[in-house]
């Protein structure tokens, strides 16, 4: 009986550690800090963000995108997905640091006015200061 209890405990601990490792690896994918710039501050949080960091996975962003309203073309940009948590104090042209954030819940009311944005959308968390390595 003791052997059966010991074996069951060992299995549970192994499964628990495996889950922790998988969770840790997923978090590592989104833990890098990047530098970006708010390129367009369109109405109703239709924001376009440019990537300034060389270590960013550019497959997550639009390689090139043209704003239909101005005709200006941007490189390595994405649409803001985290509309509820993006600081209002950041204006077009401002540079800031951010991490990718797939965990934040975005349940705020946002108006439906349209302004063109890139086809790729990312949720981010703006950092208080420069990235710490």
What positions do the PLM features span?
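Bacterial Sec-dependent N-terminal signal peptides
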Residues: 13-37
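First exposed extracellular module after export/assembly in secreted or surface-exposed proteins
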Residues: 28-133
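Sec-dependent bacterial lipoprotein signal peptides
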Residues: 1-19
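Residue-level signal for functionally critical sites in structured catalytic/ligand-binding pockets
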Residues: 3-4, 24, 44
């Amino acid at each position: 009986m003791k052997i059966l209890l010991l074996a069951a405990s060992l299995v549970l601990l192994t499964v628990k550690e495996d889950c922790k490792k998988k969770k840790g690896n997923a978090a590592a994918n989104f833990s890098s800090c990047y530098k970006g710039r708010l390129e367009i501050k369109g109405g109703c949080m239709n924001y376009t963000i440019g990537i300034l960091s060389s270590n960013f996975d550019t497959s997550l962003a639009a390689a090139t995108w043209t704003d239909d309203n101005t005709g200006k073309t941007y490189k390595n940009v994405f649409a803001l997905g985290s509309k509820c948590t993006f600081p209002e104090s950041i204006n077009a042209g401002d540079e800031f640091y951010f991490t990718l954030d797939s965990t934040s819940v975005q349940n705020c009311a946002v108006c439906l006015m349209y302004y063109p944005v890139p086809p790729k959308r990312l949720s981010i968390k703006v950092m208080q200061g420069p990235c710490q390595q």
